[in-house]
């Protein structure tokens, strides 16, 4: 399995078909996965009223690693991993926030996004039961873990406090 690391400038990818109706997913901070999904990694397709544009990464540093463990062990800085799914509303709301956080902390952390549908074995290994789930790794080891969407300033504060970084 090849894992790509991309940092900074992740384009928004959630596009509601109708902008008139308020989406209930916009008020959620995380999505709980049914046990069938956690166990088998299969997911029902989203409703026809929601469309998702593909994630695109612009102006990013891209590296390829043989495995996720290789990525964690060989990173020269802590790695914030965003476990997400394309159908998850709160995950899509985090895209511009992660872009901002990645830019703000570009000298301190690397940001990696892992699609739980494409890599269910990683989701199972790290017991991902809600989306989005963020795991901060330092020196290849799990350092901090939290679930749910956060505003950029709270996410930066959480990361800095966890790493004990003062700007």
Curated annotation (Swiss-Prot):
<dbReference type="GO" id="GO:0043085">
    <property type="term" value="P:positive regulation of catalytic activity"/>
</dbReference>
<feature type="site" description="Contributes to redox potential value">
    <location>
        <position position="90"/>
    </location>
</feature>
<keyword id="KW-0934">Plastid</keyword>
<protein>
    <recommendedName>
        <fullName>Thioredoxin Y2, chloroplastic</fullName>
    </recommendedName>
</protein>
<dbReference type="GO" id="GO:0008047">
    <property type="term" value="F:enzyme activator activity"/>
</dbReference>
<dbReference type="InterPro" id="IPR036249">
    <property type="entry name" value="Thioredoxin-like_sf"/>
</dbReference>
<dbReference type="GO" id="GO:0009416">
    <property type="term" value="P:response to light stimulus"/>
</dbReference>
<feature type="site" description="Contributes to redox potential value">
    <location>
        <position position="89"/>
    </location>
</feature>
<feature type="disulfide bond" description="Redox-active">
    <location>
        <begin position="88"/>
        <end position="91"/>
    </location>
</feature>
<comment type="similarity">
    <text>Belongs to the thioredoxin family. Plant Y-type subfamily.</text>
</comment>
<dbReference type="GO" id="GO:0009570">
    <property type="term" value="C:chloroplast stroma"/>
</dbReference>
<dbReference type="InterPro" id="IPR005746">
    <property type="entry name" value="Thioredoxin"/>
</dbReference>
<dbReference type="InterPro" id="IPR017937">
    <property type="entry name" value="Thioredoxin_CS"/>
</dbReference>
<comment type="function">
    <text>Thiol-disulfide oxidoreductase that poorly activates chloroplastic malate dehydrogenase (NADP-MDH) and fructose-1,6-bisphosphatase. Provides reducing equivalents for peroxiredoxin Q.</text>
</comment>
<keyword id="KW-0813">Transport</keyword>
<dbReference type="GO" id="GO:0005634">
    <property type="term" value="C:nucleus"/>
</dbReference>
<feature type="active site" description="Nucleophile">
    <location>
        <position position="88"/>
    </location>
</feature>
<feature type="site" description="Deprotonates C-terminal active site Cys">
    <location>
        <position position="82"/>
    </location>
</feature>
<keyword id="KW-0249">Electron transport</keyword>
<keyword id="KW-0150">Chloroplast</keyword>
<feature type="active site" description="Nucleophile">
    <location>
        <position position="91"/>
    </location>
</feature>
<dbReference type="GO" id="GO:0015035">
    <property type="term" value="F:protein-disulfide reductase activity"/>
</dbReference>
<feature type="transit peptide" description="Chloroplast">
    <location>
        <begin position="1"/>
        <end position="58"/>
    </location>
</feature>
<dbReference type="GO" id="GO:0009507">
    <property type="term" value="C:chloroplast"/>
</dbReference>
<dbReference type="InterPro" id="IPR013766">
    <property type="entry name" value="Thioredoxin_domain"/>
</dbReference>
<keyword id="KW-0676">Redox-active center</keyword>
<keyword id="KW-1015">Disulfide bond</keyword>
<keyword id="KW-0809">Transit peptide</keyword>
<feature type="domain" description="Thioredoxin">
    <location>
        <begin position="59"/>
        <end position="164"/>
    </location>
</feature>
<dbReference type="Pfam" id="PF00085">
    <property type="entry name" value="Thioredoxin"/>
</dbReference>
